[in-house]
Amino acid sequence: MNKNIKTTALSAAITMALGLSLNATAGGKGVSEVLDAVKNKANDVVESVVNSSLNDFASQFGEGNTEISIRKVKGDEADYSIITTQPLTSLGEDRARLFWQGSLGSYDQSGDRRTTLNLGLGNRWLIDDEKAIVGINSFYDYEFSSKHKRTSIGGEYKRSNVELNVNRYWAISDKHSVDGTDEEALDGYDAIFKGQLPYLPWANLVAKKYKWDRTNQDDVDGSYYGIEAYLTPETKLEVGKQDDNYMIRETYAKLTHSFGANSDHASLTDSAIATVAYQDGENMKNKMLNKVERSNKVVVEFGGITMSRTD
């Protein structure tokens, strides 16, 4: 906690203590009012300190967007990640912007905790009078302890009420032994769709289709679907079901907190029900540095038998 935060908290505490001592003799009613005021002041101080700390942390990454998330599938250990998307150029006259994206994740790989680095470059263009974004990107993925490597290319289309991302992945590391077990990163693809629910600008339907190529057994063919709800402009919760031909359908949940210049999404803190069905036609300029939607976890086959689950 920096010096300014400490000073603010100490000042607030002293002010509240003086308020109590001056008003305690005013009788039961006065004490009750003071206690309510103290509670409200304490809430304001805590909120201010937390927001200040998060903003200080986010400012270390630049003007783009940064988010932290935790994802849990029933029966598996949780996955954790931090992702930042930052500009390499300003918005040009051709309405294009070059950016980079980096992420670091801690993932459960069949009971083994592993860290993965993802680095990517992308270019996006504003089209349709700045009401839509189209983009292309390329990524490199590296799982540290196993040395699995993978590349990908992707394309995206975004509007204020709908978006579609399609990604193709290629393993560039060979099958090799990790702690006595033969492992192999897999090729594959995914397609991710998000669409606003009618009259609920703070909620999206999320659907993902994925397929991973296996050599000696049936390919992994699966999907997940759920609801993504913005609890605040910065915090969203996604809950749904994931299923493929190698797993039983299970419930998953993902909690994400974003911070940066563009954390301004409609949320439950606004009106719960909108007067129009879809929030279409909004300017997308401030969404040019939103993260690329993709699978950051390297999908691995273990001993030619078991599989890790996609994120």
Predicted regions and their residues:
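Intrinsic low-complexity, intrinsically disordered segments enriched in polar/basic residues
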Residues: 2-6, 50, 212, 224
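Feature captures outer-membrane beta-barrel proteins of Gram-negative bacteria and organelles
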Residues: 56, 78-93, 115-129, 151-168, ...
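Solvent-exposed loop/turn segments connecting transmembrane beta-strands
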Residues: 71-80, 105-117, 142-149, 183, ...
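Gram-negative bacterial Sec-dependent N-terminal signal peptides
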Residues: 1-25
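Transmembrane beta-strand segments that form the barrel wall of outer-membrane beta-barrel proteins
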Residues: 64-72, 95-108, 132-143, 153, ...
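Flexible, glycine-rich linker and terminal segments associated
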Residues: 27-53, 58, 172-206, 212-217, ...
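Outer membrane beta-barrel translocator domains of Type V secretion systems
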Residues: 37-126, 131-143
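Intrinsically disordered low-complexity regions specifically enriched for long asparagine
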Residues: 19-31, 81-84, 260
